[in-house]
Amino acid sequence: MSLTLSALPVVLNLCASTPYIVGILQKRFRPSRSSWIVWSTLDSITLAGMLAKGSANTQIISGWLLSLLIMFSVLHVTKATPWKRREKLYLAGGAFGIVLWGLTSDPLTALITSLAVIECALVPTLEGVWNDPEAEPAIPWLLGGFASVPVLVSLDHWTLANALQPIL
């Protein structure tokens, strides 16, 4: 059962990301470049914090790899535009998490900071969908959200480090 629960988030992430990446490359979807750059960068910090705490799961590992693919797909098809101040603040928040991690020697600090900033980085995507509902398909987002369920069900030890990433 544990193998199934470990594999299911990977399968759901692949099912969500594959048509999303294809749609981006075909220019049918127009995701926020800044959101995906921030997410892939901060997913790297989140994964590092979870690995350091011994709490990494298949959802974050597959999600991290796929977020990198999505980011590079987005960068491949979008024009370079100046970064907004808010977008720079999101990346600075991730850097702040790394600094806190170094100062406190506690990877949970970096994990919490990165996850908070990841949630804030959703704002440009939500603004884009509000202004142009056709810019983002709903199914990949729903499948990605459902990928958290098997991770939560399979947790042996409910700690903040284990449960925070799948919940957010």
Predicted segments, located by residue:
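Alpha-helical membrane-protein topology signature
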Residues: 1-168
